[in-house]
Amino acid sequence: MIILDFGSGETCKNDEKYVEKMIDSLAMVDKGDKDIVIKWQLFNNIPYKDRKLSALKPVIFLHAYVYAEKYGYKTTASVFDLETLIFLSCYDVPFIKLANRPELYEYSRVIRATGHKAVVSVGNSKLFSCLTKEHESVIPLCCVSEYPALAHDYIKTFSNLMHEGLSDHTTDFFLYHTYQPKIYECHYKLEDSTGPDAGVYARTPEQLKEIL
């Protein structure tokens, strides 16, 4: 499975047409050989430098969810607070994602209580192993929360675990080709995308051709 992080309201500017452009552009390079899940970011209030990040509006998420269905794509999101977790749990989603933030890990039990799987990015091998043993519906991904991150740091931290699951913040597909992870996540952007989630570690449709 390939999870593409479409970002928050920052990347799409909460614009329905830009959301459609992002999804259309993915479909144009998708050969249909991989199980692709579109993942957004849902939160109410996250500070960023000297301002707050632009949250994805619920109506925009709904539009993205419905629009992606026309291509057969499943849509979900990372959640950063209880309110957005409850909001997302009302949708038919393949899983609910938690970022590599220790304060969010307790939500994995709440997610399980809603009947959904939890995919959780973790920053060390010990926690990866613990979550693997916790419950079959809690799925960890190896993650280095640097933007961009170095492949060396992933290898040093996770070595032989990356074939199970990888949230990739490097700038190329070296780790993907080397470890062939069962679940692979990376950020997604268009050539003209802006915002904190559209850095050099985010992949364009043209770049995704390498693995699709």
Segments predicted by a language model, with ranges:
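Catalytic cores and adjacent flexible loops of soluble metabolic enzymes
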Residues: 1-212
